[in-house]
Amino acid sequence: MTDYIDSVPLEKAYRLLTHGPTVLVSSRHNGVDNVMAAAWSCALDFAPPKVTVVIDKITATRALVEGSGMFALQVPTVVQLQLTEQLGTTSLATEPDKLQRAQAELFHIDGYDLPFVTGCSAWLACRLVPEPHNQQTYDLFIGEVVGAWSDTRAFKDGHWQFEYADPAWRSLHHVAGGHFYAIGEALTVTPEK
């Protein structure tokens, strides 16, 4: 599993999110782990790298993020479609065995007290940048990226490899009500002469 995981330089971490994927948000606090799906996340800044993600007040993950001051974003693949949907439509508050029922496999990265979801194509460890007004009014959380990794079968040398990789590595893009798209064809602009 970890044979293909490599660190991504922090100055390139924004590239893990610029194509607009659905993400899995994970956090840990007081020995409790949780993972939820989020469709609204994006890169925010380059140096230091920052991201945003919307985490609703009713989610159990939000309490873990606020309690620990840390969260991880990960980019799930098309193989993880059902997992992503299940993690996004069930709550730890009402289903304490949510992660086990979803068969979510978690792993650890040394130096980070966070749960990371196995099988994703990218992972970003984030330290919460407290912005109480944004969090309370808009459910908008800002994180400073303190570590980033990718599965080199999908992202290497600072670039996504979707056009070369097995289609199973494509990222998910949530529309609504269990409807997703997978990232499509790569297009490159030809400079005008």
Regions found by a protein language model. Name each.
Residues 1-193:
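Basic, polyanion-binding surface patches
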